[in-house]
């Protein structure tokens, strides 16, 4: 009996054990289901692959498109501008700064150099290609200011000067001149356009003689008298205007062969030569002395002025009136010391009233 009860109890225990085990198995899938669902969401990292595509490097390629800006900086082309602006008072635009010097003027027997004026006088004897004997003087002149090249009457007016010519050395001292030549003797005539130091002395048309005009910017012009009226000359607002001539060089600076003048034979000569604004020359040729200097005719004189490199040249009064004076002394030795009614001279700049 006891054995039967034990067997029944043992059988009941065995039936409960599989039931509990089955219950345990059925419960574990229920708890694992929510935990295994989470890993199925992990595929979200796949967008990170697309993020890599965003790292397309268009930004660096856009940067070079901004770099052309340096090509828009051609500022170096503006640097030449300062060199193109000469000082207003400099007639030759600063092309010859080496001919002047600062400080006190330096003077020798044949030269004068200051901050505003440079004069060098050369004596030329028997120039090649010209009759012998021949003596001439060339005064090379640079000025910074147009007021350094002036004219003067022997007296206060043109009319008074015609009746009372003066000695060149007296006029040099009166005008405080550095260098002086005789002028055009215009007081002898009653025609021609005459301007001295900006002041009009006469306004009469002159078809017979060439005119010479010095403008305020330093330019010197020689004009045909039969093609230029006094009104046209005065319209230029000249600093000086002379009436004698003839012009010795053509518009290209070459020697003329024909002249509107009766005084074409060998004679003492006085010439105003021109190179460029601010650069001029006074030329005096000795003459009428066979054993010293015969003088030049107009063809020879024009060739001589061309040989000096002048671009324009104008014949002034000549003969015994021709004279060159420097530093209070006559440089040329004219046959006679004829008085002159007007002169052309170089001085230090002056302020005009």
Could you describe each region identified by the protein language model?
Residues 1-3:
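Sec-dependent signal peptide recognition
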Residues 178-182, 212-214, 273, 281-283, ...:
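Structural recognition of the beta-strand scaffold that forms the well-ordered cores
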Residues 9-12:
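C-terminal motif of bacterial Sec signal peptides marking the signal peptidase cleavage site
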Residues 142-145, 214-220, 251-252, 274-278, ...:
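Short acidic-glycine loop/turn motifs at beta-strand connectors
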Residues 189-207, 257-311, 321-353:
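Conserved, well-ordered active-site substructure
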Residues 91-92, 96-98, 107-111, 120, ...:
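Active-site-adjacent helix-turn-beta-strand microarchitecture at beta-sheet edges
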Residues 15-18, 86-206:
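Zymogen propeptides
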Residues 15-89, 102:
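Ser/Thr-rich, Proline-interspersed low-complexity disordered segments
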């Amino acid at each position: 009996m006891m054995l039967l009860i034990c067997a029944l109890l043992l059988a009941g225990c065995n039936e409960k054990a599989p039931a509990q085990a089955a219950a345990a198995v059925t419960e574990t899938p229920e708890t694992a289901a929510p935990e295994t669902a989470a890993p199925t969401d992990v595929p979200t990292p796949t967008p990170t692959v697309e993020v890599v595509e965003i790292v397309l490097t268009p930004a660096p390629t856009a940067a070079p498109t901004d770099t052309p800006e340096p090509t828009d900086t051609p500022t170096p082309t503006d640097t030449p501008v300062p060199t193109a602006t000469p000082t207003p008072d400099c007639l030759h635009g600063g092309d010859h700064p080496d001919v002047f010097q600062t400080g006190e003027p330096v003077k020798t027997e044949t030269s004068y150099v200051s901050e505003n004026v440079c004069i060098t006088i050369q004596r030329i004897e028997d120039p090649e290609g010209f009759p012998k004997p021949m003596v001439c003087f060339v005064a090379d002149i640079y000025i910074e200011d147009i007021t350094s090249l002036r004219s003067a009457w022997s007296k206060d007016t043109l009319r008074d000067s015609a009746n009372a010519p003066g000695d060149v050395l007296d006029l040099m001292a009166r005008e405080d001149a550095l260098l002086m030549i005789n002028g055009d003797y215009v007081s002898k005539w009653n025609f021609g356009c005459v301007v001295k130091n900006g002041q009009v002395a006469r306004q009469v048309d002159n078809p017979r003689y060439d005119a010479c005009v010095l403008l305020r910017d330093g330019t010197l012009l020689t004009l045909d008298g039969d093609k230029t009226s006094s009104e046209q000359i005065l319209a230029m607002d000249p600093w000086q205007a002379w009436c004698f001539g003839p012009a010795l060089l053509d518009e290209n600076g070459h020697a003329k062969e024909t002249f509107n003048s009766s005084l074409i034979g060998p004679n003492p000569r006085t010439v105003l030569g021109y190179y460029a604004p601010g650069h001029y020359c006074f030329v005096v040729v000795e003459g009428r002395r066979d054993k010293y200097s015969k003088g030049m005719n107009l063809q020879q004189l024009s060739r001589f002025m061309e040989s000096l490199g002048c671009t324009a040249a104008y014949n002034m009064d000549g003969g015994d009136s021709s004279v060159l004076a420097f530093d209070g002394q006559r440089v040329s030795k004219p046959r006679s010391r004829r008085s002159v009614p007007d002169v052309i001279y170089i001085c230090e700049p002056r302020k005009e009233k």
